[in-house]
Curated annotation (Swiss-Prot):
Protein's name in the database: Ribosome-recycling factor
Record family assignment: Belongs to the RRF family.
Function: Responsible for the release of ribosomes from messenger RNA at the termination of protein biosynthesis. May increase the efficiency of translation by recycling ribosomes from one round of translation to another.
Keyword Protein biosynthesis carried by entry: yes
The UniProt record lists the keyword Cytoplasm: yes
Cellular component GO terms held in the UniProt record: cytoplasm
Gene: frr
GO MF terms, alphabetically ordered: ribosomal large subunit binding
SUPFAM superfamilies (UniProt xref): Ribosome recycling factor, RRF
Length: 185
């Protein structure tokens, strides 16, 4: 029972860290990264469809993304979706592919992105602390129900705290990597 509580908490914390990593991947750092286009939806036959299902996305140069549609007839729809996205990148359509040149970030924009990143980090830490609280509550209920002893409860609480500390350290590590990436010119 005790190991199950810790394992469940650890798995949930890993999911929160995975979500954080995806969110940080969507923050544009002045370099081309295919994950920038993950959230772009193209209206295809009346239904919003993820761009990566309609086109291949390649990185021919450090600051250029190239979108090659599988079906050339939807080139205009893809271009429209890219214009309407909140990426702040103007697509260049050459008739068969769309090129996205990632502009260099200004110092002010870098600082804004670091602030945005801080919000993602904080929400991940809140999620981790909520998972810890849930695990601690479950452990205390188990002790009240006489499923574990008081000594086992203390050990379990220490294990849960260690898992939580490790998850918070990982979130901080991810944050420092992304911040370094954002602030490097």
């Amino acid at each position: 029972m005790a190991n199950e509580i810790v394992t469940t908490a650890q798995d949930r914390m890993k999911q929160s860290l995975g979500s954080l990593q995806r969110d940080l991947g969507h923050i544009r750092a002045g370099r081309a990264n295919a994950s920038l286009l993950d959230r772009v939806q193209v209206v295809y036959y009346g239904a919003p469809t993820p761009l990566n299902q309609l086109a291949s996305i390649t990185i021919p140069e450090a600051r250029v993304l190239m979108v090659t549609p599988f079906d050339k007839s939807i080139l205009k729809d893809i271009e429209k979706a890219l214009y309407e996205s909140d990426l702040g990148i103007t697509p260049a359509n050459d008739g068969s592919v769309i090129r996205l040149v990632i502009p260099m970030l200004t110092e002010e924009r870098r600082r804004e992105l670091v602030k945005e990143m801080g919000k993602y980090i904080e929400s991940a830490k809140v999620a981790i602390r909520n998972i810890r609280r849930d695990a601690m509550d479950t452990a205390k209920k188990s002790e009240k129900a006489k499923e574990i002893t008081e000594d086992d409860l203390k050990d379990l609480e220490n294990n849960i705290q260690k898992v939580t500390d490790d998850a918070v350290k990982e979130a901080d590590r991810l944050a420092s990597i992304k911040e370094k990436e954002l602030l490097d010119i």
